[in-house]
Amino acid sequence: MSRGPFAFFRLPRLLPAVAAVLLAGCTGVPGGVEPVEGFDAGRYEGRWYEIMRLDHRFERGLTNVEAHYTLRDDGTVGVVNRGFDPEACSWKQVEGRARFRDDPDTASLRVTFFWPFYGGYHVFALDQDDYRWAVVSGPTRSYLWILAREPELPEATREALVEKARELDFPVDELILVDHGPPVCESGNGR
Protein backbone atom coordinates (compact mmCIF):
# COMPACT_ATOMS: atom_id res chain seq x y z
CA MET A 1 0.00 0.00 0.00
CA SER A 2 1.47 3.34 -1.05
CA ARG A 3 1.48 6.17 1.47
CA GLY A 4 1.73 8.74 -1.32
CA PRO A 5 4.37 11.38 -1.92
CA PHE A 6 3.01 13.73 0.78
CA ALA A 7 2.63 11.24 3.63
CA PHE A 8 5.71 12.57 5.43
CA PHE A 9 4.00 15.99 5.77
CA ARG A 10 1.42 14.47 8.14
CA LEU A 11 4.04 13.63 10.77
CA PRO A 12 4.96 17.25 11.68
CA ARG A 13 1.28 18.07 12.17
CA LEU A 14 0.74 14.96 14.28
CA LEU A 15 3.69 15.49 16.64
CA PRO A 16 2.32 18.62 18.40
CA ALA A 17 -1.00 16.85 19.01
CA VAL A 18 0.73 13.78 20.44
CA ALA A 19 3.00 15.98 22.58
CA ALA A 20 -0.01 17.92 23.92
CA VAL A 21 -1.76 14.72 24.93
CA LEU A 22 1.36 13.35 26.62
CA LEU A 23 2.13 16.59 28.45
CA ALA A 24 -1.47 16.99 29.63
CA GLY A 25 -1.30 13.49 31.09
CA CYS A 26 1.49 14.62 33.44
CA THR A 27 -0.85 16.92 35.36
CA GLY A 28 -3.64 14.49 36.20
CA VAL A 29 -4.73 13.42 39.66
CA PRO A 30 -3.98 9.83 40.71
CA GLY A 31 -7.11 7.67 40.80
CA GLY A 32 -8.92 7.83 44.14
CA VAL A 33 -7.09 10.98 45.25
CA GLU A 34 -9.46 13.91 45.79
CA PRO A 35 -7.96 17.41 45.84
CA VAL A 36 -9.14 19.62 48.69
CA GLU A 37 -12.26 21.69 47.98
CA GLY A 38 -12.74 25.14 49.49
CA PHE A 39 -9.05 25.87 48.92
CA ASP A 40 -7.85 29.42 49.64
CA ALA A 41 -4.67 30.18 47.68
CA GLY A 42 -4.18 33.38 49.68
CA ARG A 43 -3.90 31.38 52.90
CA TYR A 44 -1.65 28.79 51.22
CA GLU A 45 0.73 31.51 50.04
CA GLY A 46 4.09 31.81 51.79
CA ARG A 47 6.77 29.43 53.04
CA TRP A 48 6.28 25.70 53.49
CA TYR A 49 8.89 23.28 54.85
CA GLU A 50 9.18 19.85 53.31
CA ILE A 51 8.81 17.42 56.23
CA MET A 52 8.74 14.11 54.34
CA ARG A 53 8.91 13.14 50.68
CA LEU A 54 9.20 10.31 48.24
CA ASP A 55 12.72 10.92 46.96
CA HIS A 56 13.36 11.79 43.31
CA ARG A 57 16.41 12.70 41.27
CA PHE A 58 15.56 16.41 41.32
CA GLU A 59 15.65 16.49 45.15
CA ARG A 60 17.93 13.57 45.96
CA GLY A 61 20.26 14.33 48.83
CA LEU A 62 18.85 17.80 49.54
CA THR A 63 18.24 18.93 53.11
CA ASN A 64 16.45 22.01 54.45
CA VAL A 65 13.99 21.93 51.54
CA GLU A 66 11.44 24.75 51.41
CA ALA A 67 8.80 25.87 48.95
CA HIS A 68 7.65 29.48 48.66
CA TYR A 69 4.35 30.29 46.94
CA THR A 70 3.36 33.78 45.79
CA LEU A 71 0.08 34.80 44.17
CA ARG A 72 0.59 36.80 40.99
CA ASP A 73 -1.66 39.43 39.44
CA ASP A 74 -2.27 37.21 36.39
CA GLY A 75 -3.86 34.48 38.54
CA THR A 76 -0.84 32.19 38.49
CA VAL A 77 1.19 31.14 41.51
CA GLY A 78 4.92 31.82 41.64
CA VAL A 79 6.89 28.87 43.01
CA VAL A 80 10.41 28.93 44.43
CA ASN A 81 11.82 25.65 45.72
CA ARG A 82 15.17 25.58 47.48
CA GLY A 83 17.26 23.09 49.39
CA PHE A 84 20.79 22.57 50.61
CA ASP A 85 23.07 20.13 48.77
CA PRO A 86 25.60 18.80 51.33
CA GLU A 87 27.73 17.19 48.61
CA ALA A 88 28.16 20.45 46.66
CA CYS A 89 28.09 22.50 49.87
CA SER A 90 25.66 24.94 48.28
CA TRP A 91 22.02 25.95 48.10
CA LYS A 92 20.04 24.85 45.05
CA GLN A 93 17.03 26.82 43.89
CA VAL A 94 14.52 26.51 41.08
CA GLU A 95 11.70 28.89 40.14
CA GLY A 96 8.47 27.99 38.44
CA ARG A 97 4.86 28.88 37.92
CA ALA A 98 1.63 27.07 38.72
CA ARG A 99 -1.87 27.41 37.29
CA PHE A 100 -5.09 25.98 38.64
CA ARG A 101 -6.30 23.07 36.53
CA ASP A 102 -9.91 24.20 36.87
CA ASP A 103 -11.64 26.02 39.72
CA PRO A 104 -9.24 27.94 42.03
CA ASP A 105 -11.32 26.66 44.97
CA THR A 106 -9.98 23.17 44.19
CA ALA A 107 -6.38 22.49 45.26
CA SER A 108 -5.33 20.99 41.93
CA LEU A 109 -2.68 22.81 39.93
CA ARG A 110 -0.26 22.20 37.11
CA VAL A 111 3.23 23.48 37.76
CA THR A 112 6.15 24.07 35.43
CA PHE A 113 9.80 24.67 36.15
CA PHE A 114 10.85 24.02 32.56
CA TRP A 115 8.25 25.10 29.99
CA PRO A 116 6.51 23.36 28.22
CA PHE A 117 6.68 20.52 30.73
CA TYR A 118 4.05 20.56 33.45
CA GLY A 119 3.49 18.32 36.43
CA GLY A 120 0.51 17.88 38.69
CA TYR A 121 0.38 19.44 42.16
CA HIS A 122 -2.61 18.21 44.13
CA VAL A 123 -3.22 19.05 47.80
CA PHE A 124 -5.36 16.18 49.08
CA ALA A 125 -5.06 16.74 52.83
CA LEU A 126 -4.89 20.16 54.46
CA ASP A 127 -5.28 21.75 57.86
CA GLN A 128 -8.16 23.89 56.60
CA ASP A 129 -8.50 25.68 59.94
CA ASP A 130 -4.99 27.13 60.13
CA TYR A 131 -3.17 26.00 56.95
CA ARG A 132 -0.34 24.60 59.14
CA TRP A 133 0.22 21.34 57.19
CA ALA A 134 -0.58 19.86 53.79
CA VAL A 135 -0.14 16.59 51.92
CA VAL A 136 0.59 16.93 48.21
CA SER A 137 0.60 14.42 45.37
CA GLY A 138 2.05 14.72 41.92
CA PRO A 139 0.46 13.16 38.82
CA THR A 140 1.15 9.61 40.09
CA ARG A 141 1.59 7.90 43.44
CA SER A 142 5.36 8.12 42.92
CA TYR A 143 5.24 11.75 44.06
CA LEU A 144 4.27 12.65 47.61
CA TRP A 145 5.20 15.48 49.95
CA ILE A 146 4.19 16.28 53.51
CA LEU A 147 4.59 20.01 54.11
CA ALA A 148 4.30 22.24 57.17
CA ARG A 149 4.66 25.89 58.09
CA GLU A 150 7.36 25.00 60.63
CA PRO A 151 10.45 22.81 60.06
CA GLU A 152 9.02 20.17 62.41
CA LEU A 153 5.59 18.60 62.64
CA PRO A 154 4.31 16.90 65.81
CA GLU A 155 4.89 13.16 65.49
CA ALA A 156 1.20 12.30 66.00
CA THR A 157 0.21 14.67 63.18
CA ARG A 158 2.94 13.33 60.91
CA GLU A 159 1.88 9.73 61.57
CA ALA A 160 -1.78 10.56 60.85
CA LEU A 161 -0.81 12.16 57.52
CA VAL A 162 1.35 9.18 56.57
CA GLU A 163 -1.59 6.89 57.39
CA LYS A 164 -3.90 8.99 55.19
CA ALA A 165 -1.44 8.55 52.30
CA ARG A 166 -1.13 4.81 53.05
CA GLU A 167 -4.93 4.45 52.80
CA LEU A 168 -4.68 5.95 49.29
CA ASP A 169 -2.02 3.39 48.30
CA PHE A 170 1.01 5.69 48.28
CA PRO A 171 4.29 3.81 48.96
CA VAL A 172 4.73 5.44 52.37
CA ASP A 173 7.43 2.97 53.44
CA GLU A 174 9.67 4.82 50.97
CA LEU A 175 9.10 8.26 52.52
CA ILE A 176 12.19 10.01 53.81
CA LEU A 177 12.30 12.50 56.67
CA VAL A 178 13.87 15.79 55.54
CA ASP A 179 16.64 17.16 57.76
CA HIS A 180 16.12 20.81 58.75
CA GLY A 181 19.12 21.13 61.05
CA PRO A 182 21.96 23.54 60.35
CA PRO A 183 23.28 22.91 56.81
CA VAL A 184 26.40 20.75 56.92
CA CYS A 185 28.72 20.09 54.01
CA GLU A 186 29.90 16.53 53.50
CA SER A 187 33.44 17.81 54.01
CA GLY A 188 32.30 18.80 57.52
CA ASN A 189 32.30 22.56 56.90
CA GLY A 190 28.89 24.19 57.43
CA ARG A 191 27.76 27.24 55.44
Model-predicted segments: where are they?
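A beta-rich soluble binding module of mature secreted/lumenal proteins
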Residues: 2-6, 26-191
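Basic polycationic patches enriched in arginine
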Residues: 3, 10-13
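Bacterial N-terminal signal peptides
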Residues: 13-24
